[in-house]
């Protein structure tokens, strides 16, 4: 095998739906079926659209065709984005990392560091300049860094699948009808397309904030556990003991007794050992 053939991991990436495998709207199912039938990587649009610099808007030098590795990545990525597409908000309800994992584009180094470069470059260096998606980064004031990109699918994206803008608009109207039917059933007023889009975006933003705070707290707890477990076991147990003594009241300590307190130290120590090696449970 030549070095050229061996320079990427997983030469045949395929999108695999997450375990929850939620039921998708009929339009999404239709679009995903089209994606399985059409070679989106060799679509005529890829040869006629002039890619542009996403910051300056100036034309970029274009290539005649995608190399086969990036073409394979694009085929998987299109299906993944469709699966997570919210018709009302026009947003992909998944992070680049999640899309990368589900497409088999992520890699792990020998020391366990994950890389999503292949997926990230596909989006940043091809899909965005071509106008198939737009991406927005939002600063997280709580954690002091950027949140995962908010990815929006454009009408051009659906043209890859031979789905017209009119079909996309009709799908939005159908989705809005379903939303309003549920609202009326609950005794609430129906909403407009613009309001439905705003609400869907707000929900995604709230969920993203909750996820990031949860993830931040998890890694903070894991870091503290790793610091404690790195100590000599006797010293670590003494620290746990002191923390438990400070936590419990005198009456609670009396009830526990020496054996009960020792048992709590054992439970806490092995719990911290488990936390120290756990990974965040991404979907």
UniProtKB/Swiss-Prot annotation:
Question: What does the entry give for GO biological process?
Answer: DNA replication; plasmid maintenance
Give the signal sequence positions. none
Report if keyword Chaperone is assigned.
Answer: no
Source taxon at top rank? Bacteria
Query: Which Cys residues form disulphide pairs?
Result: none
Question: Coiled-coil annotation: which residues?
Answer: none
User: Which Pfam family is one of this chain's hits?
Assistant: IncFII_repA
The answer to keyword Transport applying to this record is: no
Report keywords, A-Z.
DNA replication, Plasmid, Plasmid copy control
| Family of the protein in this entry | Belongs to the IncFII RepA family.
Quote the function comment for this protein: This protein is essential for plasmid replication; it is involved in copy control functions.
State the protein's name: Probable replication-associated protein repA1
Q: Which organism is it from?
A: Buchnera aphidicola subsp. Schizaphis graminum (strain Sg)
User: According to the entry, what is the taxonomic lineage of the organism?
Assistant: Bacteria, Pseudomonadati, Pseudomonadota, Gammaproteobacteria, Enterobacterales
Which gene produces this protein?
A: repA1
